[in-house]
């Protein structure tokens, strides 16, 4: 289903990357509907800031009303552009900002889709303190089961008095009034030492495993290729620890750090600059949709810990896209090496795509697989 019915119009909305027509996943959720229904009764005169609008449903519904859409996701921004075009809406009616850009001042209305990461929500609320006024309407929305006491306490601590709505279709709204409560400063960027190295790893708020190295990455770091004289991609780089290790083990290689998260790519760049400054000239950092736009038959190795979630939905289509892109971009003899949860059965997917797949190492929970592009 791709039609969202609103009180004053019908919107056609698709996920990005676009799913097969038979997929049950849609480009909006009940929290979007609840929030838009609520706004029907709230006239506003001034700019609207929208945070974490997953596929642009809110931006499309409110386009033309002085809308700014702020997201950490390059894919979400592309989805917004796609859905504006699908609905014959002018892209200029919605101004897109990444998660690290300064916010416009004195918004009349702030709409927040509650993110999965509490650290990202805190970063966004702290940034809002500098621009909202007591007259700003502040409304957040999310799944009722994901709005916890800690979520409400965060709004209250940073912005001011906070209340919630009744649940509707398992969604809930949060209402906050800005009263500028006293607030201690907080570190925006977390940092921790990487065992076995002299490095300090720095993470922006929306980066996976913000407080320390996750088990899968730790396992993967022990089984990376070495002595490659060519181009290596850390695909879905996160904070860049895999790419950092690839730099160390492949002193003649060029390493590309790619992710669809602006904060991930910024974290990767920071970690190279602070830990391996002499290697910075061998690096490229890009916010991107997998390997879209990269030339074919060029890369020597692609290293990847593919995600199996997009927002709150479990899906393998992003992993499939990464694998297909890797096969296209690898030169003959180049390899795709991944780490993944054992239950995801990437072995058969990679063997089907490449014609070969070998197990490099196994762990109680994870497996490392390698496929080589053959003529």
Swiss-Prot record:
The keyword rRNA processing applies. GO terms for molecular function: 23S rRNA (guanine(1835)-N(2))-methyltransferase activity; nucleic acid binding. Keywords: Cytoplasm, Methyltransferase, rRNA processing, S-adenosyl-L-methionine, Transferase. It is found in: Cytoplasm. It catalyses: guanosine(1835) in 23S rRNA + S-adenosyl-L-methionine = N(2)-methylguanosine(1835) in 23S rRNA + S-adenosyl-L-homocysteine + H(+). Transmembrane segments: none annotated. Its main location: cytoplasm. Belongs to the methyltransferase superfamily. RlmG family. Specifically methylates the guanine in position 1835 (m2G1835) of 23S rRNA. PANTHER family: RIBOSOMAL RNA LARGE SUBUNIT METHYLTRANSFERASE G, RIBOSOMAL RNA SMALL SUBUNIT METHYLTRANSFERASE C. NCBIfam families: PRK15001.1. This is Ribosomal RNA large subunit methyltransferase G.
